[in-house]
């Protein structure tokens, strides 16, 4: 599965899932632009990855970043909307308030989940898809989660993820005539930096590396018939079974279901 001559953009990719996605795309030959507010530590030998500083809550910042990318690369073939601000400030004055009932939640938390979430995905897609339309092909992957379908601790969280899946469905409808595929992709329990800090409290027996999500994106981007998936919600572990890849440690995580989350 080679992606030579393809240009990919992964938003919010200086760490966690986004960084794993960027690594896998680059490893399979794509030229990868990763955006984020913090400067990532460089990966050894990762000459195909270009960091573009961008605060996705700032429209001018986003427009400048995509302007730079399109100036340098002249095209965007793959867009992975991964940026997410919903986990910031989960503690207030040392107290975990993220899972409080909605009537006790500050409105800034709702705003954070949408501004650095579905709104950021919408804006990035607006800027990226004209390049795809011009070539009548492209892939947009919106990273989402089961909270779109089931309450998982925070009302605003669920609404923002449901909005992401609706964004996927409606963008897919408008972009299908142009040969562009849009999907939502659900990871499982991912061994991100933050998760590993709490590893002693978690059951990681069915967890996934950040690169596993990247392998799912690579598989979709490599499939000439990928448009059969457009508008769908896909689970990374199900994608692994369909396309026959495993995680970086050789394991194949079991796909989660609503009953598991």
Enumerate the language-model features and the residues they cover.
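Conserved glycine-rich cofactor-binding loop
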Residues: 7, 14-15
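Conserved glycine-rich Rossmann-like NAD(P)H-binding loop of the short-chain dehydrogenase/reductase
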Residues: 28-43
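Active-site Tyr-X3-Lys motif and surrounding loop/helix of classical short-chain dehydrogenase/reductase
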Residues: 64-71, 90-91, 96-104, 108-115
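C-terminal helical subdomain
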Residues: 184, 202-261
